[in-house]
C-alpha cells in the first residue's frame, strides 16, 4: 500500500514539468522533413496486427466519427474508414499525407477520410504520435476535442525503431520508454480516470543480403553503440533465414526481402483510454 504522504506526493508532483525536462535532454525531435523521408516506406495495403488490436480496444460505436492525430500514411485511418467510420486524418508531414491520399484512392474512401495538414499545435488526437514536448498540452487538447472517449497509445518498452532482442544479444545499450507512466499520472491530475491495456504488435524485418541487413539494422546503433557493428554483422549472419514470403507485399505494401531474422520483433504498447473531463463541449 501507498501511505498518505507518498500518495500526496504522487498527486502533487509536476509530471509534465519532469516530462519536458526529459524531452529537452533527448535527441532532437523529428520534424515534418524527417517524416517526409520515411513516407516512402509506409504503404499500408493491409490491416496490420497493431491496427486490429487498436481498433478492438477503441471500441467505437457504429458510424462514430474519429479524429486521428498523427495519422501518418493511414495505418489506422484506412481500416477505420473501411469499417464505416468518418475519419479526419491529420498529420504535419506532406509526404505522409500524399501516401495517405494514394491509399484513399486505392480503396475508394474519398467520402470517408478527410486529410488535413496539421501539427500538435493545431489540434489533437493520437495513435503512437502523442510523444510531444508538452505532453499535458497534447492530452488536454485531445480531451477537449473528443465528445465520448479519448485514447492514446505509447510505447511500453523500447522504441519501435529498435529490435530489443537483437540489441540485447549484441550487448548494445538501449533505454526503454516509460512515457506512458507520465501520461497516466498527468491524466489523473487532470481529473480523468484512465484505463491502461497493454498489447504487443509483431514486426518482421526483411532484407536481400547480409550486407543489406547490416545496413538496415545499423540504424539502431546510435548513442554510443556504433562500435557494435561487427557484433551486429556476426549476429545477422548466424540468425538470417530464408523468408518464405519473399517478394510478397509486407504490412506496409513494400515487397519483402529474401531473408529475415529467426525471431519476430515485438513492440509493447500501452493503450490509455478515458472519458473526457473538459467542460464546455457540445
Q: What are the residue ranges of the model-derived segments?
A:
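Short, conserved SAM-binding segment of the class I
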Residues: 137-141, 145
Amino acid at each position: 500500500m501507498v501511505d498518505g504522504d507518498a500518495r500526496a506526493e504522487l498527486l502533487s508532483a509536476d509530471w509534465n514539468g519532469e516530462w519536458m525536462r526529459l524531452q529537452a535532454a533527448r535527441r532532437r525531435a523529428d520534424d515534418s522533413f524527417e517524416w517526409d523521408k520515411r513516407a516512402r516506406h509506409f504503404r499500408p495495403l493491409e490491416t496490420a496486427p497493431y491496427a486490429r488490436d487498436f481498433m478492438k480496444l477503441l471500441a467505437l460505436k457504429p458510424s462514430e466519427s474519429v479524429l486521428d492525430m498523427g495519422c501518418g500514411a493511414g495505418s489506422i485511418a484506412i481500416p477505420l474508414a473501411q469499417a464505416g467510420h468518418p475519419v479526419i486524418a491529420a498529420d504535419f508531414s506532406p509526404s505522409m499525407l500524399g501516401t495517405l491520399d494514394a491509399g484513399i484512392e486505392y480503396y475508394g474512401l474519398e467520402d470517408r477520410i478527410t486529410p488535413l495538414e496539421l501539427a500538435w499545435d493545431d489540434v489533437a488526437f493520437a495513435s503512437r504520435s502523442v510523444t510531444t514536448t508538452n505532453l499535458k498540452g497534447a492530452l488536454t487538447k485531445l480531451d477537449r476535442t473528443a465528445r465520448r472517449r479519448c485514447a492514446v497509445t505509447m510505447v511500453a518498452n523500447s522504441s519501435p525503431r529498435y529490435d530489443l532482442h537483437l540489441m540485447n544479444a549484441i550487448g548494445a545499450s538501449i533505454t526503454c520508454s516509460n512515457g506512458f507512466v507520465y501520461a497516466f499520472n498527468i491524466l489523473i491530475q487532470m481529473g480523468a480516470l484512465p484505463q491502461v491495456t497493454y498489447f504487443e504488435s509483431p514486426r518482421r524485418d526483411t532484407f536481400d543480403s547480409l550486407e543489406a541487413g547490416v545496413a538496415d539494422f545499423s540504424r539502431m546503433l546510435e548513442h554510443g553503440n556504433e562500435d557494435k557493428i561487427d557484433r551486429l554483422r556476426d549476429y545477422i549472419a548466424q540468425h538470417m533465414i530464408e523468408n518464405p514470403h519473399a517478394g510478397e507485399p509486407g504490412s506496409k505494401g513494400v515487397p519483402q526481402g529474401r531473408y529475415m531474422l529467426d525471431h519476430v520483433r515485438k513492440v509493447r504498447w500501452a493503450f490509455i483510454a478515458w472519458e473526457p473531463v473538459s467542460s464546455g463541449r457540445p
